[in-house]
């Protein structure tokens, strides 16, 4: 039923209506920008207008009370304008330079968020940005690890790299709570991926009551499921199962969780940028770390070892994979203190046609 004068579907607002007036006025007409200090970026327009972007790291999930606190601060210092980045940083827009320090102090006092997450490529001084990650235990139905808890533990340990410019080049860290990879773990400098190591255990009673068996069987990408028509349930071929969780998505009677065997793998060397060389996919360097909530000490230790070994030995502007290619993987494992095992050797080989013929870069002439 349509009610006269009532509109319920507004859709996304036009983005230009939400821009700070200085940004809207100078849209596409910026002269240059510079990093004043970690977390503060000065942008200068061709018209001479200046605006400062002040960045703070925030959790991915925020309460409405915290959001309201940040909005109150935005009303006070940035004309009521703020935005969140794709890496879960909140940014304020300040036109009066004298307000910057007061803004930073008030955010830290009221909500406790650190200022940082920027870099200065001209000087070759880089800070660590926030971690992009998936839902984890709080919402996702197939996670092998938590997301928010691990990100909090890792960033607490790497806090100094967020608030200062101590790194030689850009470094992106990401996390996905299972191999479905809602996060950008396939192409990040350092990536944490949740992995299941045991197949689902069918709950026959739940399958009979809640599941459509043909759809569940068809959802398996490796053909590891077969219908058990006699008992009206599903059988799992353990040898074919790759622990992806697709069956649990279709059927609540196929739980995949295993507190003892679920854990995380660490990957390194991915990147999306085409600067200097083509994009790269991440490689596994730690095949499995157990779940150790609430602070995941072993996982955090490995991530810090990798980051600090790279930071201490890389050249300026040298991404992690570029550093590895220069020194070699053997030297990488020596410097990071990680153990090389047979689990790191990939037994999958893509077809020669696909591997050799398809482009991996957009850097070509028409």
UniProtKB/Swiss-Prot annotation:
Location of the 4Fe-4S ferredoxin-type domain: 232-262
A Pfam family reported for this protein in Swiss-Prot or TrEMBL: NIR_SIR_ferr
EC number: 1.8.1.22
Cofactor: [4Fe-4S] cluster; siroheme
Subcellular location(s) of the protein: Membrane
Reactions accelerated catalytically: [DsrC protein]-trisulfide + NAD(+) + 3 H2O = [DsrC protein]-dithiol + sulfite + NADH + 3 H(+)
The keyword Cell membrane is annotated on this UniProt entry: no
GO molecular function annotation: 4 iron, 4 sulfur cluster binding; dissimilatory sulfite reductase (NADH) activity; electron transfer activity; heme binding; metal ion binding; sulfite reductase (ferredoxin) activity; sulfite reductase activity
Binding site for [4Fe-4S] cluster 2: 220, 241, 244, 247
GO cellular component: membrane; sulfite reductase complex (NADPH)
Function recorded in the entry: Catalyzes the reduction of sulfite to sulfide. This is the terminal oxidation reaction in sulfate respiration.
Protein name: Sulfite reductase, dissimilatory-type subunit beta
Protein species of origin: Archaeoglobus fulgidus (strain ATCC 49558 / DSM 4304 / JCM 9628 / NBRC 100126 / VC-16)
Lineage: Archaea, Methanobacteriati, Methanobacteriota, Archaeoglobi, Archaeoglobales
Name of the gene encoding the protein in the UniProt record: dsrB
């Amino acid at each position: 039923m349509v009610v006269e004068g009532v509109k319920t579907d507004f859709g996304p607002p036009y983005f230009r209506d939400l821009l700070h007036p200085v940004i809207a006025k100078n849209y596409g007409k910026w002269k240059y920008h510079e990093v004043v200090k970690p977390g503060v970026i000065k942008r200068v327009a061709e018209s001479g207008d200046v605006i400062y972007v002040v960045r703070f790291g925030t959790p991915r999930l925020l309460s409405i009370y915290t959001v309201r606190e940040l909005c109150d601060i935005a009303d006070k210092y940035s004309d009521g304008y703020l935005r969140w980045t794709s890496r879960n940083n909140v940014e304020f827009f300040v036109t009066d330079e004298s307000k910057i320090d007061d803004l930073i102090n008030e955010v830290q006092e009221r909500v406790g968020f650190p200022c940082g997450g920027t870099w200065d490529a001209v000087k070759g001084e880089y800070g660590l940005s926030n971690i992009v990650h998936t839902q984890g235990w709080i919402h996702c139905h197939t996670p092998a690890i938590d997301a928010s808890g691990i990100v909090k533990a890792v960033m607490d340990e790497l806090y100094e790299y967020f608030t200062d410019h101590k790194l030689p080049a850009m470094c992106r860290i990401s996390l996905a709570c299972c191999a479905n990879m809602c996060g950008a773990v396939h192409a990040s400098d350092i990536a944490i991926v949740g992995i299941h190591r045991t197949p689902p255990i069918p709950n026959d009673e739940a399958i009979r009551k809640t599941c459509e068996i043909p759809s569940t069987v068809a959802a398996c990408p490796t053909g590891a499921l077969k219908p058990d028509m006699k008992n009206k349930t599903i059988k799992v071929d353990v040898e074919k199962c790759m622990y992806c969780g697709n069956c649990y998505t279709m059927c609540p009677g196929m739980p995949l969780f295993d507190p003892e065997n679920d854990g995380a793998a660490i990957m390194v060397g991915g990147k999306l940028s085409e600067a200097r060389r083509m994009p790269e996919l991440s490689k596994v360097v730690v095949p499995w770390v157990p779940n150790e909530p609430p602070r995941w000490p072993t996982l955090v230790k490995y991530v810090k070892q990798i980051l600090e070994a790279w930071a201490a030995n890389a050249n300026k502007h040298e991404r992690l994979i570029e550093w590895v290619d220069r020194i070699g993987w053997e030297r990488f494992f020596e410097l990071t203190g990680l153990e090389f095992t047979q689990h790191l050797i990939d037994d999958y080989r893509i077809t020669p046609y696909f591997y050799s013929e398809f482009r991996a870069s957009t850097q070509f002439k028409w």
